[in-house]
Amino acid sequence: TETETTSFSIPKTDQPSSPKFVSGQPNLIFQGNAYSTDGKLILTEAKQNTVGRALYSAPIHIWDRKTGKVADFTASFTFYIRPNSDSQVVADGFTFFIAPVDTQPRGDGGLLGVFNREEYDPTIHTVAVEFDTFHNQPWDPDYIHIGVDINSIKSRITRPWNPHYDTYSIAYIAYKAATNELDVTVTYPNSRDYATLREVVDLKQIVPEWVRVGLSASTATYYSAHEVYSWSFHSELGGTSSSN
């Protein structure tokens, strides 16, 4: 069988002048408070107790039970966290997540729209990369961080992150199926500052063969606007048998 690929890019990377996010972006599924308008995807406005999620509409074949193969993938998005002008507190953050095709919004605030509780729950079959701007007790470390979450909002790994609220952030995520390594990097324009982490994640043991990928953000008592200016994704699932 041939290699299966899925790719999307908003705006199209080979056409820099192509439209950015348009109103009612046709290849996205909006959940909760998310919507697109005039060049950007707004996951949450600066309001209390909101969850916004955007899913790529086409299901993605992330691994194949017959061959044992798992897809390699890359994802990148540029995002802006617009602090609440009335408060110096920023909350709660973004995720890029991989979940079953029928995934629905979950808890707001520190649960980032992807999880409902701290306890490990294998029934939700979800992996998320979080960009967490608020310390939520009892599960968060006592610093602003990026992290990898597997079936729980309590991150398996975290690294300190210094968000820049005066500019946009560039997130890059890459997964190598051969080693199960998930790499995450956040950078900024005109800055050498960055955050990075690597974690071993066995997708076959966590998510179903067919998934959707999405972006989420949430707020609670404290809040910020969470906006996305571009989003791209590419996956390749090899077709050769693992027994060859």
From Swiss-Prot:
Q: What is the lineage of its organism?
A: Eukaryota, Viridiplantae, Streptophyta, Embryophyta, Tracheophyta
One Pfam family here: Lectin_legB
Segments for region (Disordered):
1-20
Q: Which GO terms describe its molecular function?
A: carbohydrate binding
Instruction: Specify the domain of life of the species encoding this protein.
Output: Eukaryota
Identify the keywords attached in UniProt to this record, alphabetized.
Answer: Lectin
The organism is Lathyrus sphaericus (Spring vetchling)
Coiled-coil regions listed: none
Q: Which family does it belong to?
A: Belongs to the leguminous lectin family.
Its assembly, as annotated, is: Homodimer. In contrast to other Lathyrus lectins which are tetramer of two alpha and two beta chains.
Query: Which protein, by its recorded name, is this?
Result: Lectin
PANTHER family given for it?
Answer: CONCANAVALIN A-LIKE LECTIN FAMILY PROTEIN (PTHR32401), LECTIN (PTHR32401:SF45)
InterPro entries, A to Z: ConA-like_dom_sf, L-lectin, Lectin_LegA_CS, Lectin_legB_Mn/Ca_BS, Legume_lectin_dom, Leguminous_Lectin
